[in-house]
From Swiss-Prot:
<keyword id="KW-0255">Endonuclease</keyword>
<dbReference type="GO" id="GO:0004527">
    <property type="term" value="F:exonuclease activity"/>
</dbReference>
<dbReference type="InterPro" id="IPR018246">
    <property type="entry name" value="AP_endonuc_F2_Zn_BS"/>
</dbReference>
<feature type="disulfide bond">
    <location>
        <begin position="16"/>
        <end position="20"/>
    </location>
</feature>
<keyword id="KW-1015">Disulfide bond</keyword>
<dbReference type="GO" id="GO:0030430">
    <property type="term" value="C:host cell cytoplasm"/>
</dbReference>
<keyword id="KW-0479">Metal-binding</keyword>
<dbReference type="Pfam" id="PF01261">
    <property type="entry name" value="AP_endonuc_2"/>
</dbReference>
<feature type="binding site">
    <location>
        <position position="271"/>
    </location>
    <ligand>
        <name>Zn(2+) 1</name>
    </ligand>
</feature>
<feature type="binding site">
    <location>
        <position position="142"/>
    </location>
    <ligand>
        <name>Zn(2+) 2</name>
    </ligand>
</feature>
<feature type="binding site">
    <location>
        <position position="115"/>
    </location>
    <ligand>
        <name>Zn(2+) 2</name>
    </ligand>
</feature>
<protein>
    <recommendedName>
        <fullName>Probable AP endonuclease</fullName>
        <ecNumber>3.1.21.-</ecNumber>
    </recommendedName>
</protein>
<dbReference type="GO" id="GO:0008270">
    <property type="term" value="F:zinc ion binding"/>
</dbReference>
<keyword id="KW-0540">Nuclease</keyword>
<dbReference type="InterPro" id="IPR036237">
    <property type="entry name" value="Xyl_isomerase-like_sf"/>
</dbReference>
<feature type="binding site">
    <location>
        <position position="231"/>
    </location>
    <ligand>
        <name>Zn(2+) 3</name>
    </ligand>
</feature>
<keyword id="KW-0269">Exonuclease</keyword>
């Protein structure tokens, strides 16, 4: 279930005006076939990302549904950076998130990723309760990156506390998005195979609270040191999490994450947004070749 973030800017043909998301996905699928790694998943923006504006047009909706069905893709949408239903603007935000969820349903997108805030679990649950569930579309709460806040949601204990509250409140269609760069930035050392295995075994221990069917990953290396609180992604084995394991990859924490993802068939997205299409495709070719070697 491996794939990548598909940016309209870097993947669509020049001059594209009406069906740019579909066009981007078509080019992305063709690229996967070209490098010998047929993609099973993808992540897109259907709104924003920095403004509360829907940016998928009517024609694009029709064609995107066909494209997703044709290639049997698992696609998730990333919410805008304003999608914070536990904020003071929650009435407007909740309405906008509801629009995004309905569009996801309409075009065959399986989930919407929202950034978790560094706030108490009860505030997050109260915000989620304002959103009406949309059948077949999961809201994935993404692990945040922070340094000083009490609630980082990078430890299994805090993840369990949050999802117990979610379950006990009766909320449906809520999942977890684990960003490896974020939990590293928040102070969790996942560089070695053994350190990652310890964290992931603890995650498996709470599968009764948050099942793997409701877990996805943002598979990113990080350009900053562990516990920095700074979110800066890097290509796999090019950042500070796993670069020291580039010549002994099966001893890396990344290898353990790939084992978990494969074992439980979780979607995993590489989030890369480089300067040009050529830079992006060069980086992704190397990364997916590495993943291919893991999966042999």
């Amino acid at each position: 279930m491996f794939g990548a973030f598909v940016s309209h800017r870097l993947w669509s043909d020049s001059g594209c005006t009406t069906t740019c998301i579909t066009n981007s996905i078509a080019n992305y699928v063709a690229f996967g076939e070209q490098i010998g790694f047929p993609f099973k998943s993808a992540q897109v923006f259907i709104a924003g990302p920095r403004k509360a504006v829907i940016n998928i047009q009517k024609d694009d909706k029709v064609e995107l549904l066909k494209m997703i069905d044709k290639h049997n893709l698992w696609v998730v949408a990333h919410g805008t950076y304003l999608d914070v239903p536990w904020s003071r603007r929650s009435a407007f935000v909740t309405h906008f998130i509801q629009q995004e969820l309905l569009i996801c349903k309409e075009v065959g997108i399986k989930g919407l990723v929202l950034h978790l805030g560094a706030v108490e679990p009860e505030l997050i649950v109260e915000g989620l309760k304002k959103i009406k569930p949309v059948e077949g579309v999961i809201i994935y709460l993404e692990t945040p990156h922070n340094k000083h806040h009490t609630y980082k949601y990078s430890t299994i204990e805090q993840i369990k506390e949050l999802f117990l509250r979610i379950r006990n409140t009766g909320l449906k269609q809520i999942g977890l998005c684990i960003d490896t760069a974020h939990i590293w930035s928040s102070g969790v050392n996942i560089s070695s195979y053994n350190s990652a295995r310890q964290w992931l075994r603890s995650l498996e221990d709470i599968h009764s609270v948050i099942p793997p069917s409701h877990i996805m990953f943002h598979l990113n290396d990080a350009a900053t040191k562990c516990g920095s609180g700074v979110d800066r992604h890097a290509s796999l084995f090019e950042g500070m999490i796993w670069k020291s394991y580039s010549h002994k990859i099966k001893h890396s924490g990344l290898y353990c994450f790939v084992e978990y993802i494969t074992r439980h068939q979780c979607p995993a997205i590489l989030e890369r947004n480089l300067g040009s299409s050529m830079q992006l495709q060069t980086a992704l070719t190397a990364e997916f070749n590495t993943l291919k070697s893991f999966l042999k």
